[in-house]
Amino acid sequence: MKESSRLRGLYAITDSKLLADGRLLPYVEAALKGGARLLQYRDKTSDEARRLREADALQELCARHGAQLIINDDAELAARLGVGLHLGQEDGSLAAARALLGRQAIIGATCHAQLPLAEQAARDGASYVAFGRFFQSHTKPGAPAANHELLREARARIGLPIVAIGGITLDTAPSLIAEGVQMIAVIHALFAADSAAEVERRAQAFSQLFNTP
């Protein structure tokens, strides 16, 4: 599968608080049924055994639905499962992760609102770069704001797929996609829902934005 086709569409990111009390697997499966093409497992706790169990179960769900699993900030877990990795600016060396995971692995990099960080990530072997926050974010409310001009500059200077993240909703996503963003990363606007059925409905709505002419 070409990288361009693997790295496009709704990028769902888990949240250990939103998806507590048994919601993780049913809500994630609902997002995948709704069309999410990538799933990032983001869990900052120290319970390695539980994270391995959950990541293994998520890998099975992603395989069943033809989606890509990305592990947040745990290169060893990503290597163990043979899946992708996402690194923040303080999560270790991207070049070292590339050496560990191999040439074919998907490795993404958080670049905040800074084009130089994205250019460095591209040199270090990133598969995609993530910019944000674009709007007020529940997950990282104090993060510096990114804007549409940054996206235009990044498209002109970096030959990698771009992820937009940070407070994105169904109302605000279209303007980002219109700027050429290949992936929209969503947490609360997807998973802060009362039921798995609602998650699936939201995922379908986000996914349809990428099919609009």
UniProtKB/Swiss-Prot annotation:
Q: Which GO terms describe its biological process?
A: thiamine biosynthetic process; thiamine diphosphate biosynthetic process
Q: Where does Mg(2+) bind?
A: 73, 91
List ligand-binding residues for 4-amino-2-methyl-5-(diphosphooxymethyl)pyrimidine: 40-44, 72, 110, 140
Question: Into which EC class is this enzyme placed?
Answer: transferase
Q: Which residues bind 2-[(2R,5Z)-2-carboxy-4-methylthiazol-5(2H)-ylidene]ethyl phosphate?
A: 137-139, 167
Cleavable signal peptide = none
| Entry keyword Transferase | yes
**Listed GO MF terms:** magnesium ion binding; thiamine-phosphate diphosphorylase activity
| InterPro entries xref list | Aldolase_TIM (IPR013785), ThiamineP_synth_sf (IPR036206), ThiamineP_synth_TenI (IPR022998), TMP_synthase (IPR034291)
Family annotation (Pfam families) = TMP-TENI
Record's superkingdom?
Bacteria
Its Gene Ontology cellular component terms are: cytoplasm
Pathway assigned in UniProt: Cofactor biosynthesis; thiamine diphosphate biosynthesis; thiamine phosphate from 4-amino-2-methyl-5-diphosphomethylpyrimidine and 4-methyl-5-(2-phosphoethyl)-thiazole: step 1/1
Which reaction is the catalytic activity of this chain? 2-[(2R,5Z)-2-carboxy-4-methylthiazol-5(2H)-ylidene]ethyl phosphate + 4-amino-2-methyl-5-(diphosphooxymethyl)pyrimidine + 2 H(+) = thiamine phosphate + CO2 + diphosphate; 2-(2-carboxy-4-methylthiazol-5-yl)ethyl phosphate + 4-amino-2-methyl-5-(diphosphooxymethyl)pyrimidine + 2 H(+) = thiamine phosphate + CO2 + diphosphate; 4-methyl-5-(2-phosphooxyethyl)-thiazole + 4-amino-2-methyl-5-(diphosphooxymethyl)pyrimidine + H(+) = thiamine phosphate + diphosphate
Q: What is its EC number?
A: 2.5.1.3
Similarity annotation: Belongs to the thiamine-phosphate synthase family.
Q: What exactly does this protein do?
A: Condenses 4-methyl-5-(beta-hydroxyethyl)thiazole monophosphate (THZ-P) and 2-methyl-4-amino-5-hydroxymethyl pyrimidine pyrophosphate (HMP-PP) to form thiamine monophosphate (TMP).
What name has this protein been given in UniProt? Thiamine-phosphate synthase
> What's the source species for this entry?
Stutzerimonas stutzeri (strain A1501) (Pseudomonas stutzeri)
Q: Which gene encodes it?
A: thiE
